[in-house]
C-alpha cells in the first residue's frame, strides 16, 4: 500500500510535530506499508526537491516567492494552498499513491482534499491541534476574530468531507462531534514513544560535571519554549523551591520564542541552567540528569484539548512527571500513579508539589516505574501504528464500494 504523507515540516528539523511524523512513518514501514513524504513550503531546511532520509523518500516544496502577498489576509494562505495542490498531485501521480494522509494544518488538508477528489483516492486528515487555536497562541490572530472563525469553519468543512479523520486525543474527537462531524468517522491515534529509543539510562556524570550540577534534585524541561508551555511559572517558582531545597537545580533544555524572556526572568537567580538547543544525538544525556520532569502548561483552549508528547517521553525514561492539571495532561497522567498534577498557573501549588517530590526519592521512583509501564503497555508506536493499518484498509474499501456503486447496473 503506497501512502503519501503530507506534512508541514519534517526531520531534519526537530519538533514534536516532526518526531511524531517520523515515528508514524517508520512504524508503518515496519508493518509492510510504503510511506513517502511531501513537505510544505514551511519546511526550509532543504533545497533539494527530493531527499532520502533513513530510507524514506522526502519530497520537498520550494519556498514561495516573497512578493508581499503574505501581508494580505488570506491571500498568502491561498497562494500556499494552490502551490501545495499542484505539488501533491504531482507527487501522488509519481509515487502511484493509493491513499493520501494529510497532517495538519488546514493549509495541507484542503489541497489534499482537492487532489484526492480529483484522483479518486481516499484522504485521511490528521489534526495534531486545531490550527486556529495554535494561531491564537502564536499571536497570528485573535480568538473569535473573523480569521479565527473562517479557519474554524474551513477545518470543520475539511473534517466533514475527508474519508476518515484522526485526532491525537479524545478531547479533540469530542470537540469535532460538537461541530457535527460523525463520531464514527474520527479515530484517535494518541501520541506515542519509541520505547527502544526512550528508556531509563544511567546518569551522564560527564555532562553533570560539565554543567556543575551539585548532586541535588534536578527539575527539568526538554523541548520548545512556547508561551503556552508555561515555563515562566517554574522559573518564577524556583526561588521559593530553592528556599526549601537549597541544592535543587532547574535545567531548561531547548529554545524558542520565550527563551530570552525566561533568561531575563532568571537573571538574578541561582541554580537555573539554560543549555540552548542541543543536537538530537545528545538529548538523552540531558534527560538522564533530570529527576523531576516539569510540564507547567497554561490553561487555554489549546492545552485543554491537546495532549503533548513531552510527558510521554519523560515517562518512557522513568522520570517522575510533574504537570499542570490542564485537560491535555489529565488525559495522559493518572494523578498520583503515573505522575503528579498541580493547579495550573498556581505558583503556590507548583512549589508545594515540587518540594514534596524533591524530598521523596521513593515516590519519584514509584511514579517513574508506573509511567514507564504505562508507555510500554499503551503508548508504544509499534502498537499504535496498527490503528492506521486498519483505518487505511477501511478507507480504501469504502472508496472501492463508492466507485462500484457509481457504475450503472447495466455495466456491472
Model-derived segments and spans:
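Carbohydrate-associated surface elements
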Residues: 171, 192
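Nucleotide-activated donor-binding/catalytic signature segment of Leloir-type glycosyltransferases, i.e.
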Residues: 260-284
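Conserved acidic donor-binding segment of nucleotide-sugar-dependent glycosyltransferases
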Residues: 334-336, 340-347, 356-362, 377
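N-terminal subdomain of nucleotide-sugar transferases
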Residues: 1-62, 241, 400, 404, ...
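Short hydrophobic beta-strand element within catalytic cores of glycosyltransferases
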Residues: 295, 313-316, 320-323, 333
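Conserved donor-binding/catalytic core segment of Leloir-type glycosyltransferases
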Residues: 4-6, 213-238
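Acidic donor-binding loop of glycosyltransferase active sites
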Residues: 95-99, 163, 288-304, 319-320
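A short helix/loop element that forms part of the nucleotide-sugar donor recognition site in Leloir-type
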Residues: 50, 199-213
